[in-house]
Amino acid sequence: DADKAGDYNLSNIDLINHRGEAVDLKYVVVEMNIYESIYKNAVTGSIVITDAKNQIGRLEVQGLERIAFKLASPGITDAEDLLDASVETGEPFHVYKITDRKQVNQGLLVYTLHFASREFMRNLRTKVSQAYNGRLDMAVQKILRDEKYIDTRKRLKYEKTGNSDKIVI
């Protein structure tokens, strides 16, 4: 159970490169932020890392990396309240940017990795060009589920629309 507000369970934070090689960053992460907002279309986050072993150089970070972890509040057992970004059961986040890279002293590098959900990355790379006929909620579901478009595997929560429309996106 939680002793203090803000307590959390985080067993590991793996940075996985394009070859599938993973490095546990749990002990070199200074700060982790996760952002979710009704005003944004995806979950994003950042982690600040103190790197004394040149892990970023050894992994050959090139923009195809993923970050895998499971984050929960102590005492939480409901899967819906767990942020599962693991390789086995969830959907790892994708690294899209490295910022604030600083050489603090000889052998110690500090930098920030920015990451986002798989859907965020697919949305950046995918253009929808199609006509839809019917309820708009069905068109949105099709775009989100279709393998050619967003291809989300997440459970969707939506409200049915009452009218039928023709729309070209």
Region spans (language model):
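Juxtamembrane "anchor/assembly" segments of surface/extracellular structural proteins
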Residues: 1-78, 111-122, 138
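Surface-exposed cap/loop segments at beta↔alpha junctions
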Residues: 55-168
